A protein has these predicted regions:
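Glycine-rich, proline-tolerant flexible connector loops at the mouths of alpha/beta enzymes
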Residues: 33-67
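The substrate-binding groove and active-site-proximal loops of carbohydrate-active enzymes
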Residues: 52-58, 83-90, 115-119, 227
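Short, well-structured secondary-structure segments
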Residues: 30-37, 78-83, 112-113
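Histidine-acidic metal/acid-base catalytic patches
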Residues: 1-40, 73, 98-102, 108, ...
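Short aromatic-enriched loop/helix-cap "lid" or pocket-rim segments at secondary-structure transitions
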Residues: 44-46, 155-158, 226-227, 264-265
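Catalytic-core regions built around general acid/base machinery
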Residues: 58-74, 131-138, 201-205, 237-241
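Positions that flank functional sites
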Residues: 39-40, 86-88, 118-120, 151, ...
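Active-site acidic/histidine proton-transfer and metal-coordination neighborhood
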Residues: 66, 70-78, 87-185, 191-192, ...
Length: 288
């Protein structure tokens, strides 16, 4: 039986993390991804960091996370993984990464996704992960690198970035050679023309080192983060590859654009649709 999970940031920005956890449990999810993008801010146009007033950024951040865990336990849902803030090329954001790992442990999560620096080599990113791994191990949390992408405005498509290909991803993992650094494959990124080389191929190449997922759909050009089965990705092929690779982790959605289509009073309906899409992938894996 495959367990299903989802990011909570897209709902939390509208109804708060507490209500998001409660409603995702009601919708039928087994778990949630503690998405910590609100821990700090980044102006992508200006390339500048800015501070946040979110509870993740305040002195009582652990109490806030502890309360989320309590709500989840009461509702029958748990945290399986988390996502640290990014981009890590920003030194101010890097200063929050240990806090993100600490929050992951407090929430009960097993894995914290920490992006590599898009434009650094495997060896350079290894040094970055080496700085975090002792802290993560002390808190009982694994770190997962993720396949990234850049954008080529001239070509009108994505372009290579750290971990974008199987070769690059494996080079990053091999540069660290620590079982506590694992792979989170972003299915949508892997399918983007110009940078990725196809999710099924990357799933098979990563094998047992693949321990987390970000699942969403796109048109194979843009990073759309839409609900599975709504655009162009072949989730039958993805499910077959996951089954072949003996993937044992959670099926975690990152379809964070989907709820934009729902008014606040209809958000729960959107959550149910997300759950149904994740359950459909789980069924495809069982049938593969």
């Amino acid at each position: 039986m495959y367990r299903i999970s989802t990011e909570i940031h897209s709902a939390a920005t509208r109804i708060g993390e507490e209500k998001a956890v409660e409603l995702y449990a009601k919708a039928g999810f087994d778990a949630y991804d503690l998405s910590m993008f609100s821990m700090c801010g980044y102006d992508w146009a200006k390339g500048r960091f800015y501070e946040s007033d979110h509870p993740f950024a305040k002195s009582n951040y652990l109490a806030f996370v502890r309360n989320l865990r309590r709500i989840g336990e009461e509702c029958g849902i748990h945290c399986n993984q988390s996502h640290a803030p990014f981009p890590v090329c920003c030194k101010e954001i890097r200063s929050y990464l240990k806090r993100a790992i600490e929050c992951t442990a407090e929430a009960g999560g097993q894995i914290c996704i920490v992006h590599p620096d898009n434009n650094k080599s495997p060896e350079e990113n290894a040094e970055f992960y080496f700085e975090l791994l002792p802290f993560a191990k002390a808190h009982g949390v694994k770190i997962a690198a993720e396949n990234m992408w850049n954008w080529d405005s001239k070509a009108g498509c994505s372009s290579f970035a750290a971990c974008a290909t199987s070769e690059s991803f494996l080079a990053h993992l091999n540069a660290v050679k620590d079982e506590n650094l694992v792979a989170c494959l972003d299915i949508g990124h892997a399918e983007m023309r110009g940078s990725g080389e196809g999710a099924p191929h990357m799933i098979r190449a990563l094998g047992s080192r693949l321990q987390a997922l970000h699942i969403h759909d796109n048109d194979k050009l843009h990073d759309s983060h839409q609900i599975p089965f709504s655009m162009e990705i072949d989730f039958g092929a993805v499910a077959a590859a996951l089954k072949e690779a003996d993937y044992r982790g959670y099926l975690t959605l990152e379809a964070d654009s989907n709820l934009n289509d729902y008014a606040e009073e209809e958000i729960f309906s959107g959550m149910v649709r997300l759950k149904e899409s994740a359950a459909r992938i789980a069924l495809l894996m069982e049938q593969a």
